[in-house]
Amino acid sequence: MLSTIQQLLEKQDTQTLTAALLHSSRWLLGERLHYGPIQQRGLMANWLDITTHFETVELCAKVQSGDVEAGVFCLSSASTTTYFIAQCEHRNGAIKQLLQWVDSASLAAHYNTKEAPGYDNSMSLPFWPEPDPLQLSEFDPQLHLKTTHAGINDVVASNTSDKSKALLSQWWQVWQGFDTAGIKELYSDATHISVNSQVLNKEGSPSVLSWLNQLEGKLHRRYCQLEQVIADERNALVRWRIDADLKIDNGLIRVRLPIATMLTFNDNKITNEYWVVDSIAFEKRFGAPLPF
């Protein structure tokens, strides 16, 4: 069913996607769930408008496990590359749930350069939704040292190979457990790793180690939690989040960063890694910019 999104973006085909959506289907964009054909037609129209601002649309990687498919799309023009991740949960030819995470800051910057002269609000999109309300707990892992938290093996499908489970567990230990020594085991100099539109691990860019240190340094009392893992032999989508204290002008605020990470791997090494975080949704929800 991921092909319905691809057809919408590449061929401006609204009918195939419309036919696959039920009245009860849920569509997540901008950290807001949309229900029903009226709201969903509006989302399709906005995506069709967005694609006219880019020259190519490419499905860079995808993964499927049972009735769930996910992929990372690359929207490109001469000057800009924007990533977004889509996940479809379907049954009997109908989409039950469609989730999207978009590099909205990069999208807005490129989209607004095409607007009329004088339009300078480059970090906003007029049609981007208001996020759903969110209540955060004050869970502090320092006060619960013996608490057991979900790991890769707890959330990944039981038929996932042991090899994929082991690699993903190593990856989770690096990013959740601040395991800097594990970076060399997972990443090579040839690994493509991007956080939204920022590409790491290349000349003139931060290394993976530098990025991990930056993440740990800017987000205080950082607590990572897995939400879903979809994996096969060569690809995986990890949905996870970080709850943390973020320093702003008026002190500290508790924030949550929902993150979608698409991975491709080979010979126990990660070859491509794409992180997507919705910057506009974060700023709308917490009144502060992303810390990276």
Ranges and model annotations:
Residues L48-N159, E216-Y223, Q228-F292:
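A beta-strand edge to alpha-helix "cap/lid" segment located at domain peripheries
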Residues M1, Q39, K163, L167, ...:
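Soluble or luminal CAZymes and related metallo-dependent hydrolases
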Residues S161, S169, N201-K202, D249:
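A generic secondary-structure micro-motif detector
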Residues M1-D13, A20, T147-D179:
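Short, aromatic-enriched amphipathic alpha-helices that serve as compact interaction elements
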